[in-house]
Amino acid sequence: MERDIYLIGLNHRTAGVEVRERFALTDCNVLEQGVVPIDDVVSEVLILSTCNRVEILAVGRGPEVVSRVLRGWSAARGQCEHDLAPYVYTHKGPEAIRHLFRVASSLDSMVVGEPQILGQLKDAYRKAIERNCTRVILNRLLHKAFSVAKRVRTETGVASSAVSISYAAVELAKRIFGEMNQYKAMLIGAGEMAELAATHLLHAGISKIYVANRTFERGRELARQFNGEAIHFEDLFERLADADIIISSTGAHEAIIRARDIKDVLRRRKHRPMFFIDIAVPRDIDPDVNNLDNVYLYDIDDLKEVVEENLAQRREEASKALTIVEEETGKFGQWLRSLELQPTIVDLIRRSERIAQDELARTLKRLGPVDDETRDALEAMLSSMVRKLNHEPITFLKRRHSEEDAGPRYIDIARRMFNLDDDNVPPDAHCDRRRHDEDN
């Protein structure tokens, strides 16, 4: 049974944020081989886990690959497999390749054209390499995905008018507060999404930006870029009272802000409204915070309306991008099928070379002692014959194997025609048997 590429995942379309955070596979709680062991069934694996999707790429043999991934994934999160199954999609072969290329090109993102997903995919690939979880197929596939994403960016306008999740968050704040120049914002977390949010807040005219991060130095570095103020993480709740808008995007595995924490903050603010946007998955802010008076909490799923407006501007460019994806999916499929053909070509050449060497040995035995020049000439002649005799069959197989449906059939015919799977009978035995029949 030949190896194939499988992609098993869930995303913002198939699962709400509550489900996505339950089944998130972040770096701290999972290793690729901890979810799906590398063995005879699964030979390669990569995990992509972001705020909007969790996807597992696997190379393996047979339908057991999918069941093994689902079983390992749910177990890694301490959940039941039947709770995961309703939200999951499964792609195999060309569909898996196509889906990955769409993801890398940001055509499958909540915000089509956003640049973050490519960086997240590269990071996931780097970690998989470090853990020795990728081989020939995933290495080739991921590099191709990166080049497809580059083609989409350079040959279409998909990314030119793209918004990010951070942009959508700031747009939502502007709709609620209107003019931003009299309000202050706090960013919790100092990663890429926080940096983008700071950029958009500054452009919107926010009067002050605070940055709270577990690593104070990183928070101070980000705050310095935007003339903001860095806050020690342990002082977070003391300083929350200074902020009207809070955008949180940490990598925490459980809520860092709860309703009981905000009650005292509100009292010190004299119950002036607070606007929280939680763009982390798992969520940083307990949903119960939204039950407090004068507190407005939005999570990543609430940004869809802002995103939809932006999507309409880019549908035509997305259509051009999908054409590129289809073209590259076909090319990669041809390369993948060529891998299936390679063992047959190698076996055919080795068989021919064995026959040639056996015949050379038999001829030299009949001739008796020959000088080195004669021996070299005989070997060169046989080598040339092997090459020329194999040229047509190999060319034919390569040409026919590029046909997706017919390829495996021609491999099977070739292997039977040339006895490539007959390990018990040496190639020269067939020749001897035929000679014996002819002599009689």
From Swiss-Prot:
GO biological process terms, semicolon-separated: protoporphyrinogen IX biosynthetic process from glutamate
Positions annotated as active site in the UniProt record: 51 (nucleophile)
UniProt: substrate binding residues: 50-53, 109, 114-116, 120
PROSITE patterns: GLUTR (PS00747)
Gene3D superfamilies found in the cross-reference section: Glutamyl-tRNA reductase, N-terminal domain, NAD(P)-binding Rossmann-like Domain
Documented EC number(s): 1.2.1.70
Catalysed transformations (reactions): (S)-4-amino-5-oxopentanoate + tRNA(Glu) + NADP(+) = L-glutamyl-tRNA(Glu) + NADPH + H(+)
Top-level taxon: Bacteria
Pathway as given in its UniProt record: Porphyrin-containing compound metabolism; protoporphyrin-IX biosynthesis; 5-aminolevulinate from L-glutamyl-tRNA(Glu): step 1/2
UniProt comment concerning the protein's domains: Possesses an unusual extended V-shaped dimeric structure with each monomer consisting of three distinct domains arranged along a curved 'spinal' alpha-helix. The N-terminal catalytic domain specifically recognizes the glutamate moiety of the substrate. The second domain is the NADPH-binding domain, and the third C-terminal domain is responsible for dimerization.
Function: Catalyzes the NADPH-dependent reduction of glutamyl-tRNA(Glu) to glutamate 1-semialdehyde (GSA).
Subunit structure: Homodimer.
Similarity-based family: Belongs to the glutamyl-tRNA reductase family.
Other notes: During catalysis, the active site Cys acts as a nucleophile attacking the alpha-carbonyl group of tRNA-bound glutamate with the formation of a thioester intermediate between enzyme and glutamate, and the concomitant release of tRNA(Glu). The thioester intermediate is finally reduced by direct hydride transfer from NADPH, to form the product GSA.
The protein's name in its UniProt record: Glutamyl-tRNA reductase
Protein species of origin: Nitratidesulfovibrio vulgaris (strain ATCC 29579 / DSM 644 / CCUG 34227 / NCIMB 8303 / VKM B-1760 / Hildenborough)
Source lineage: Bacteria, Pseudomonadati, Thermodesulfobacteriota, Desulfovibrionia, Desulfovibrionales
